[in-house]
Amino acid sequence: MGKRTAENSAANGEGEEKHPEIGVDGRPEKEPTFQDYMRVFKYASKWDLLAYTVGVIASIGVGITLPLLNIVFGQFASKFSDYAGTETLPGDEFRSKLSELCLYLLGLFLGRLVLGYITNFAFRMTGVRITSAIRQDYFTALFSQSVHVLDSMPPGYATTIITTTGNTLQLGISEKLGVFVEYNATMIASIIVAFIYSWQLSLVTFTAVVFITFSVSLVLPYITKGQTNQTKSEAMAMSVASEAMSGIRMIVAYGAESRIGSKYGRFVDEAKKHAQFAGPFIALQYGLVFFSSYAAFGLAFWYGTRLLLEDKINQLGAIIVVLFSVMMIVTAMERISTPLLAVSKATVAACEFFTVIDAPRPEPGHLTDPDVSATEDIILEDVTFAYPSRPHVKILDNLNLRIETGKVTAIVGPSGSGKSTIVGLVERWYGLKDQYVISKPVEKPTDKKNNGGKEEDEQELQELSFAGDETGPPVDLHGRISTCGHSLDDINVKWWRSQIGLVQQEPFLFNDTIYSNVLNGLIGTKWENEPDEKKREMVHEACKEAFADEFIEKLPEGYNTAVGEVGIKLSGGQRQRIAIARAIIRRPAILILDEATSAIDVRGERIVQAALDRASKNRTTIVIAHRLSTIKKADRIVVLRQGQVIQSGTHEGLLTDEAGLYYNLVNAQALSLGEQKEGNEVIAKEERPSSVHEKAHTESTIEEKPLEKKPKNKGLLSSFGRFFYETKSNWWMMALTLFFSACAGAAVPFQAWLFAKVIIVFGYLPDESKVRSESSFWSLMWTVLAISAGLAYCATFFLSTRTASTIRAKYQKQYFLYILHQKVAFFDHDDHSQGTMAARSAEDPRQLEELLGSNMASVFIALWTLMGTIAIALAFAWKLALVSLCVVVPILLAAGYWRMRYEIKFEEMNNAVFVDSSKFASEAIGAFRTVASFTLEVAICDQFRTLNSNHVKDAFKKARWVSLLYAFSDSATIGCQAIVLYYGGRLLLSGEYDLESFFVCFMSVLNAGETTGRALSFGPNVAQVRAAANRILGLRDSQVKDGPEATGEQFISHGDGIEIELENIYFKYPTRDVPVFDGLSLTIEKGQFAALVGASGSGKSSIVSLLERFYDPDHGRILCNGQDIATNNVYTYRRHLSLVAQESSLFQGTLRENILLGVEDTVDDAAVHRVCQEASIHEFIMSLPEGYQTQVGSRGVTLSGGQRQRVAIARALMRNPDILLLDEATSSLDSESEKLVQEAFERAGKGRTMVVVAHRLATVQNADVIFVLGEGKLIEKGSHRELLAARGVYWQMCQSQALDK
């Protein structure tokens, strides 16, 4: 099958299509170009372009203000020196010049404030508007594609583009772009100013720029390498954490906390190693930058003095202007990397958007009613098909099939036989023409040499996920699907889908009301524009037909009840009935039922099946089913195997062929019903779920109670003290960090003093020898300061980064284990969801790193700087210092803090803008098939457009004030300088202070305020750190109480199974105030095969959870061999149990590692092979090239459902348990896989107690005892035959599933 890549050649005017490389994930790779970035601006309206133009001009103006400030400050220095040093300037003239220069500063302040506001507001709003437009275009383009396009993307990829990638793009085209223009303007203007005042001094001083650039370029590759590898290791650790949180019950059940914790810890230790590799280079970079900055001052003053004495410079101000201009260039060069990186990321983000926007869109077809009709047969002729995401694997092989109009056609067969593929082809999600795959943007490859083979390792990791894919030539797609003599490709796709009603195994409901979800079924039909009253009538009618009205009317909000995300507030049966109502309100000519009842319990299935039977009348109906009891009445049953029709006929007709596949499938699910009597009517009340059950479920979705009393939160100082005490092995490093940070902090007050001394030197004129000797001495002092500051900063950051990485790794590993050792009830709370706890396992220790690591070192430096500058300012000029401290320093502190905090938090603020539309996009993309099937594309895109429009309006309101605050914080320094200079000048005129006192105070105050404000902004966010510290300490305290070291009686087993007694159990889940058990009592004898059956919500799985001690009963006891399990050590007790759940929960790693999850690694191969033979999986494993060392991929994705389940059985048997718990272990398997798994269970049950929860009663009819649960109590118990003879609830359940009637 050929692949065409979604190139933007048409849009870019490229005449020749390039063939990109194919990545390891099968997707073509495309390299982003700057052309992608520039193309984004085509989404700008004329008003956006005008705003951009104004913003660029304003940014240039903002950038020029600082070089102009240097000129004014140089003039100040000259005039102050002339007045107080050489005394060549009269007092009145100095007073006049002082006022004039202060007015210049005030003008620069106001100009920067206004221009800063304009540029920030203009770039922010245009960025939001353009990003909104491109998100909308992407969203529309995505929903114009076929389903296979989404299939070609990794899971969650499209949602990530809308959310994270969209935010990245916005960053790169908004303020960051304005900052880029500003810094370029600053650099250019600074160069011009410096060379105008003294080209010779400029060239000499520029050596500092060259030195900084050269030194940074030397160490940066090593820093990048270390941080890149650290990020990779952290990503792998995060992958382990995510997988662990999603399979937490299985980890707890198998006592695998330590094993998973060790696996996680290996990646954390790797990340620490890489962080410590980069640490010395980060420290060296800091040291070199600060050394060169201070050294540049000494060099400039030394050489400037020489030029002044040689009359090549006419005043002191020229030296100041050149020096400050060069320092400004260094600062701009340092800061311009941030917007450059943002633009680079935005280029990649733009490419991500355009790969979908430019993707060729499928031909919609042109035929509609009356040219074609949906009431004719659908014919598949010689159809051969493979999915675009797996082009080498043939799914359908020359398939020929006729789906007759007005009749029910059921399609059955083993997994992978092509049943659901036929649905996809009829729905036109896929076609029989060559399919294309969306390309994957990749950044330009860097040099891979000397990288320790990391690239190869990463590629190998990626390839593991595709280990199961077959290779070979792509499958040649061919064949024809037609109706009314026309190919489906020629029929308008929206019209065709409007004739189809689809009900899937997992129905997707939007986070809206029941009424709106059902109403969605009318979109695209001729009733779409009917009056609201008519629509409401149709909704009610459809819900009645689907048996949904009965539970809807019992809800407090009725049809206006919100269903929650993906319908979470409704039970499975309720969701399914809403989906049926949504399908039949369309009054479709064709009804497709794809596993519509497979995930519903017996009682729910009975009701849903009745609704489906009613909906199928007089319609062309296609039914895909694993439960063959649901398709006995089909007009025609088609049996598939390996993509071909091998049998077809009625249920009765196919059963006559005892050698046929259908007979074997039925036999695998057959229930023995004993002697039948006439009139197998089912009690009427079974047609409807009990009001108690419905009410209970409804209440359970609304009312929640707190998990438990939360531990009292500790303050930041208390948490800091506790962590500080626990890290006493690192005290010596912390003490040294504190000492060197004090040395680094002393550099700023010392710099202020040296600056004043240098200014005084020029007061010795015209004594040139004195000036020369003094300038040499004080320039040497600058060099001493440069070396000292460089060493202090280097030592501070070397020690702090090393300490931080050590502390983070220690607590990250511990914290992850604390999480794993929590009770299962802990994870039921909304605040402790799987995703939240996976993220916290990395984020909370990172916050702790900020509390005790390098960022805190910056805070220490800032505090030492503040104390030092205040002390020296008060010592030299207390009056000016007090005014500055009371007025200027608070403003500078607040401005510096806010500005840097704003820059750090900008991305967070940016993300918040589109949060609602991002959620909606995520939901819509998750329902892609539902949207396509019900022709909801236009409605979805319109809703997304409305949300985006609202976000833009909200952003406009926020931007007005945020931009003003940012502009003020950015320009406040200039205003404060004007205040200090004016007041200081007045004090000089009055003779209260000399030149040295003034300049020491002036430089101290300005440097202290701005430097400290910036440094403090890098400090930890107090609220976040406090919350993270409390979570870590809180989980540790609860973990110690419940951990594996906890005391408790040792559980005693005598082999051959365990007797289980539940005595008067009362139980409700901690997060719901709805009783599950109300005095339940039952006994399972030693070595028995016991089955638990009953309606959904009857407590079957809850018994398994109680036996596993995931929860404790509120009242009553659970006894095993006469021992109360609550008194046993939970970890030793669980060693006697093994759990196999509906979700097999395999983890990344080899098959052997998964099988040995709950036991020691020292088990020999013979034992592993033996349990795999018992689980009927050994032969399959040995057929794999890597055998037991085969990687299973994330969540076992490279294995089929049946294979995963058999591996899970082998894992359970490996523990040689006394109790085997099987919770819906076969409910999602096809008949063939189920039969293999069932045989494995029956072998596994010998010599042990086996407790089985099942919906399919055929899997438990051989049980020694069957317990029928309902409404919190035991309704019936007995063997299969005994319960049939009683003709009670169990008999009714069997009637609804029987296959041989």
From Swiss-Prot:
Gene Ontology biological process terms in this record: oligopeptide export from mitochondrion
Protein name in UniProt: ABC transporter BEA3
Induction remark: Expression is highly repressed by the histone deacetylase HDA1 and the beauvericin cluster-specific repressor BEA4. BEA biosynthesis is also repressed by the activity of the H3K27 methyltransferase KMT6.
Ranges of residues in domain ABC transporter: 378-667, 1060-1296
Biased composition (Basic and acidic residues): 15-30, 442-454
Major location category of this protein: membrane
Annotated transmembrane regions: 54-74, 103-123, 177-197, 203-223, 281-301, 313-333, 745-765, 779-799, 858-878, 880-900, 961-981, 987-1007
SUPFAM superfamilies in the record: ABC transporter transmembrane region, P-loop containing nucleoside triphosphate hydrolases
Matching InterPro entries: AAA+_ATPase, ABC1_TM_dom, ABC1_TM_sf, ABC_transporter-like_ATP-bd, ABC_transporter-like_CS, P-loop_NTPase, Type_1_exporter
Residues reported in the UniProt entry to bind ATP: 413-420, 1094-1101
Keyword Nucleotide-binding annotated: yes
Pfam families, alphabetized: ABC_membrane (PF00664), ABC_tran (PF00005)
GO MF term (any one): ATP binding
Reported phenotype of the disruption mutant: Does not affect the production of beauvericin but increases the expression of BEA1 and BEA2.
Segments forming domain ABC transmembrane type-1: 54-345, 735-1024
GO cellular component, one term: plasma membrane
Glycosylation-annotated residues: N229, N511, N618
Purpose of the protein: ABC transporter; part of the gene cluster that mediates the biosynthesis of beauvericin (BEA), a non-ribosomal cyclic hexadepsipeptide that shows antibiotic, antifungal, insecticidal, and cancer cell antiproliferative and antihaptotactic activity. Functions as a regulator of beauvericin production, rather than in BEA transport out of the cell. Beauvericin has low toxicity to the producing fungus and BEA3 does not play a role in detoxification and self-protection of the producing fungus.
UniProt region (Disordered), positions on chain: 1-30, 442-461, 682-708
Gene that this sequence comes from: BEA3
Topology of this chain in the membrane: Multi-pass membrane protein
Species, as recorded: Gibberella fujikuroi (strain CBS 195.34 / IMI 58289 / NRRL A-6831)
Family according to the record: Belongs to the ABC transporter superfamily. ABCB family. Multidrug resistance exporter (TC 3.A.1.201) subfamily.
Subcellular location(s) of the protein: Cell membrane
Record keywords, A-Z: ATP-binding, Cell membrane, Glycoprotein, Membrane, Nucleotide-binding, Repeat, Transmembrane, Transmembrane helix, Transport
